[in-house]
């Protein structure tokens, strides 16, 4: 019988085994021990079962914690993520200190999900770059700016050698720089910079609006030649992203932004784990890129959580691996640490670390590219900076975070 396995962290539960049995029955058949034997036989295939209960040390002296895993028969729900989440963590999410930390799906269930359309290799193939972490920059301070300002910002970032440029997640449809115009004009700017430098850059445009409009808007973006889509997935829902990823008329990579996810993941004892929501479920539902706070930036995640997201993005599975994109407060001096912790197959994503460079976006991009090359070539950073003024200026401004 096919099942979905849900793993939870319980906090301050006096009898974990009893609690696990209550959850297994309560979220499937309801009461069990009070049922007559005939009814029990009829409902047995629908009943959840406790797979394991493990006690663990709490985070404080007076706190008790346990990890439980419960198997839910797939016969109880349709093969979609909303049905699963409602079953395993619907009303349960309102019932005390309990956190959903993982979900394991059957191979049959996985076949009903799209996974990333491009994945790491597909994105690298689009760019023709296979040997280093990719570099992404973000539009900053664009609200209230006209199209000319935005085009110049795009141009400067591309001249700096970044591989991807994304809209800010709070850059919505507006009359100064409409969605379709940004795509058309942005493509022309990037065409010109590629002719000038030989370097290809992709632009991810923010897909926004009412949910019912998104599919048609994304299809229109594809018709206009958009490179990729940015989606505030947790404002809309994972199922919305899945629908976009499954649509054959939207042959575009999807970049999943973590906005709003903190409401679900930030508590150590409530909600969902970062790895499950930003890693596994993002990947399964079609994200080619999953953005999340890095462990050492301005909005930092615990390092263990950030690395767990990355692991879920790239571990062997039936789906293409997704690019992990640790973000927030990234500057060139952090690159050795990023590459040590996240390896080659991740994206270095910077906003202020590029735009705040003394020589602007172009200088910021060049500084990042220089230090990436230095790490790959095992060249001392000081030696690289001596031959690259842009890198030296960046290190003078932000310093260097040592990889210890």
UniProtKB/Swiss-Prot annotation:
Keywords: Amino-acid biosynthesis, Isomerase, Magnesium, Metal-binding, Methionine biosynthesis. Its cofactor is Mg(2+). The modification N6-carboxylysine is found at residue 166. It catalyses: 5-methylsulfanyl-2,3-dioxopentyl phosphate = 2-hydroxy-5-methylsulfanyl-3-oxopent-1-enyl phosphate. Its EC number is 5.3.2.5. It is an enzyme of class 5 (isomerase). It comes from the Bacteria. GO terms for biological process: carbon fixation; L-methionine salvage from methylthioadenosine. The active site is at residue 91. CDD domains: RLP_DK-MTP-1-P-enolase. Substrate binds at residues 140, 166-169, 257, 329, 351-352. Catalyzes the enolization of 2,3-diketo-5-methylthiopentyl-1-phosphate (DK-MTP-1-P) into 2-hydroxy-3-keto-5-methylthiopentenyl-1-phosphate (HK-MTPenyl-1-P). Homodimer. Belongs to the RuBisCO large chain family. Type IV subfamily. This is 2,3-diketo-5-methylthiopentyl-1-phosphate enolase. The gene is mtnW.
């Amino acid at each position: 019988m096919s099942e979905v396995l849900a793993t939870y962290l319980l906090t301050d539960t006096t009898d974990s085994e009893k609690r696990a049995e209550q959850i297994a029955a309560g979220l499937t058949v309801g009461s069990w021990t009070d049922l007559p034997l005939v009814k029990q036989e009829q409902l047995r295939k629908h009943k959840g079962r406790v797979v394991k209960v493990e006690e663990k040390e709490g985070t404080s002296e007076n706190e008790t914690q346990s990890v439980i895993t419960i198997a839910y028969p797939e016969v109880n729900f349709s093969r979609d993520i909303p049905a699963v989440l409602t079953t395993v963590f619907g009303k349960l999410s309102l019932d005390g200190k309990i956190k959903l930390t993982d979900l394991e799906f059957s191979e049959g269930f996985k076949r009903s999900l799209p996974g990333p359309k491009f994945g790491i290799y597909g994105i690298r193939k689009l760019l023709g770059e296979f040997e280093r972490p990719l570099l992404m920059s973000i539009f900053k301070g664009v609200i209230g700016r006209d199209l000319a300002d935005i085009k110049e910002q795009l141009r400067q970032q591309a001249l700096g050698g970044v591989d991807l440029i994304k809209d800010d997640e709070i850059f919505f449809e507006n009359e100064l720089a409409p969605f379709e115009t940004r795509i058309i004009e942005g493509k022309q700017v990037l065409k010109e910079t590629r002719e000038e430098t030989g370097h290809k850059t992709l632009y991810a445009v923010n897909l926004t609006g009412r949910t019912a409009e998104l599919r048609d808007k994304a299809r229109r973006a594809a018709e206009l030649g958009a490179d990729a889509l940015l989606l505030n997935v947790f404002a809309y829902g994972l199922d919305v992203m899945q629908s976009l990823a499954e649509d054959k008329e939207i042959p575009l990579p999807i970049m999943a932004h973590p906005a709003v996810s903190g409401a679900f993941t930030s508590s150590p004892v409530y909600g969902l784990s970062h790895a499950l929501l930003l890693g596994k479920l993002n990947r399964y539902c079609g994200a080619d890129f999953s953005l999340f706070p890095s462990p050492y930036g301005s909005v930092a995640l615990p390092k263990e959580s950030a690395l767990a997201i990355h692991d879920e993005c790239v571990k062997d599975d039936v789906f293409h691996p997704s690019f992990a994109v640790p973000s927030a407060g990234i500057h060139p001096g952090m690159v050795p640490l990023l590459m040590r912790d996240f390896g080659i197959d991740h994206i270095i994503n910077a906003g202020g670390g590029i735009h705040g460079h003394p020589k602007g976006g172009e200088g910021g991009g060049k500084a990042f590219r220089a230090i990436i090359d230095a790490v790959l070539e095992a060249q001392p950073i000081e030696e690289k900076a001596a031959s690259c003024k842009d890198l030296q200026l960046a290190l003078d401004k932000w310093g260097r975070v040592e990889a210890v």
